[in-house]
């Protein structure tokens, strides 16, 4: 499929090193409680169909996605034991080709002087150099948080992507989804904490 994308001029490997990475992967992961509270598999399938649309926006287009698979065969053992039933952990894996837009200019050797230095063609070059947007961090009043040198504190780019995904899902009608705590290292919910959650509470990670 990668070679076909090259043949169809969807991507370009021009100037790419032999050992360069050709693929990236994103994992969309929501805790097991959220889907179990909504009935399980069918709800998770619909949720991740919408999440896939968010992935398309993030990578720049569906043409760069190689595969998107929802894993539905993993059991959250802690929750299953606590509730006395199988509670599955659903998540979505998206494998894609990372690209950056690159303009190729006419060289000084071009016979037509008027063309020299102008854009000859635009390619989508396979590259992991794309930098996701970082945004200034703000306090509860919406004011920028500053460092001691007066420069704004920037939120990590993956946190911005998490925000974008969260907002996408909310706009799509999943209004009971709650964004995970920023800068939290917690990934899984324990059986004890699960039993104290309200039905709509969830932790969402990109």
Q: What do the predicted segments below correspond to?
A:
Residues 126, 177-180:
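Intrinsically disordered, low-complexity sequence elements enriched in Ser/Thr/Gly/Pro
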Residues 127, 186-190, 202:
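Secondary-structure junction/capping motif
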């Amino acid at each position: 499929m990668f070679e076909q994308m090259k043949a169809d001029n969807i991507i370009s490997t021009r100037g790419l090193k032999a050992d360069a990475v050709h693929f990236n992967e994103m994992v969309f992961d929501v805790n097991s409680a959220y889907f179990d509270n909504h009935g399980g598999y069918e709800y998770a399938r619909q949720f991740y169909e919408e999440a896939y649309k968010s992935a398309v926006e993030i990578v720049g287009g569906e043409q760069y996605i190689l595969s998107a698979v929802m894993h539905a065969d993993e059991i959250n053992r802690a929750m299953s034991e606590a509730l006395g039933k199988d509670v599955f952990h659903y998540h979505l894996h998206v494998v894609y080709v990372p690209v950056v837009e690159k303009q190729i200019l006419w060289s000084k050797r071009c016979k037509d002087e008027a063309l020299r230095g102008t854009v000859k063609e635009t390619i989508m070059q396979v590259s992991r150099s794309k930098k996701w947007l970082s945004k200034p961090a703000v306090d509860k009043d919406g004011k920028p948080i500053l460092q001691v040198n007066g420069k704004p504190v920037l939120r990590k780019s993956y946190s911005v992507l998490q925000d974008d995904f969260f907002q996408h899902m909310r706009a799509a009608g999943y209004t009971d989804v709650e964004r995970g705590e920023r800068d939290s290292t917690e990934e899984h919910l324990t059986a004890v904490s699960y039993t104290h959650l309200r039905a709509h509470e969830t932790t969402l990670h990109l």
